[in-house]
């Protein structure tokens, strides 16, 4: 992994993308009951489409280098916790020297696993923790690089509003946009 910029590590963040209109109910009348079937619905989870108050959403999990260029991307449904997509993203790159992430990634197992591998973990502790872990505030300021990467990613209309039904089609568009961002950055 190429180390450039002031921080020699990776940044991590998940971002939600809405799919369709807010009142889109997938062809069902709003007062109609759920269809009779056993087990969980197929299709939506496999296509990384989740439901939340804002409608159907998808999370893009991204890992960037110190220059804000995307290294690894993956999709999960919008209601899934951020740690769900973390394993897939971290498996695609070698262990970074520094990992900067937001509070949603504050988990003891994650900290221990990355510290064992020699990675410095910079994650602000969850305010409900009894024993908060130490973190470097100055190094955490570099997290805005991933926010700017997501801003550049959402400049592409197809990424900002998900028009694709299938997750692999949408992910290919995200990866194509990430390639353009890498090339221009």
Pin down the residues of each PLM region.
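Short alpha-helical elements
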Residues: 1-185
């Amino acid at each position: 992994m190429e180390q450039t910029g002031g921080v020699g590590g990776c940044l991590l963040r998940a971002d939600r993308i809405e799919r369709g209109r807010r009142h889109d109910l997938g062809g069902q009348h709003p007062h109609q009951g759920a269809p009779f079937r056993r087990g969980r619905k197929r299709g939506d989870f496999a296509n990384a489409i989740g439901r939340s108050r804002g409608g159907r959403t998808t999370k893009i999990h991204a890992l960037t280098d110190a220059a804000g260029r995307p290294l690894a991307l993956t999709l999960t449904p919008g209601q899934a916790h951020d740690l769900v997509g973390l394993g897939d993203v971290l498996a695609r790159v070698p262990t970074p020297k520094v990992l900067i992430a937001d509070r949603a990634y504050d988990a003891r197992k994650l900290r221990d696993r990355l510290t064992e591998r020699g990675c410095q973990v910079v994650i602000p502790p969850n305010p409900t923790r009894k024993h908060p872990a130490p973190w470097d505030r100055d190094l955490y300021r570099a997290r805005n690089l991933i926010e700017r990467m997501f801003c550049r990613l959402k400049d592409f209309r197809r990424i900002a509003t998900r028009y694709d039904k299938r997750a692999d089609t949408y992910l290919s568009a995200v990866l194509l946009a990430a390639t353009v961002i890498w090339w221009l950055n």
